Regions:
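Short acidic loop-to-helix transition motifs that present clustered carboxylates
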Residues: 13, 69-70, 113
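Short Gly/Pro-enriched turn/cap motifs at secondary-structure boundaries
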Residues: 9-11
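Short, well-ordered beta-strand micro-motif
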Residues: 20-22
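Pre-active-site segment of Zn-dependent metallo-hydrolases
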Residues: 13-16, 25-64, 76-77, 81-82, ...
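Hydrophobic alpha-helical bundles that form the membrane domains of multi-pass transporters
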Residues: 66-74
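Extreme N-terminal starter segment of soluble prokaryotic enzymes
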Residues: 1-4
Length: 113
């Protein structure tokens, strides 16, 4: 039973981090962020990860290292049944950000501490 590490995005840039740790029975994503740019018109490319943003596979949880947008910016793309984990401060800031950008109906208290 081996441990696998997959970097989905973030090896050739600052920001837009998404990595995954998995075994034969468990899959955990670490961060799901937006890419960074100095261009004010830049829009981060949607990050599509099978089992996380669609139903082609499964994911047990997503762990957020901290609340910066380059680590949490694509949180709302994560399937709602996947558990989200973050520290107390990160959770609070992520909920405030979700309410600001999407309204309270999308900002569910899904994060666990």
């Amino acid at each position: 039973m081996g441990l696998k590490l997959c970097i989905h995005r973030g090896t050739h840039q600052i920001g837009g981090i998404a990595a995954e740790i998995s075994t034969a029975t468990t899959r955990i994503l670490i961060d799901m962020g937006d890419e960074l740019s100095l261009d004010p018109n830049f829009v981060s490319a949607p990050l599509n990860i099978p089992g996380v943003t669609d139903t082609d596979g499964c994911c047990d949880a997503v762990l957020f290292t901290h609340y910066h947008g380059d680590h949490t910016g694509q949180t709302l793309r994560i399937r709602p049944e996947i558990s989200l984990y973050a520290g107390a401060l990160a959770k609070e800031i992520m909920l405030i950000s979700a309410r600001h950008w999407c309204g309270p109906y999308r900002a569910k208290s899904r994060c666990r501490r």
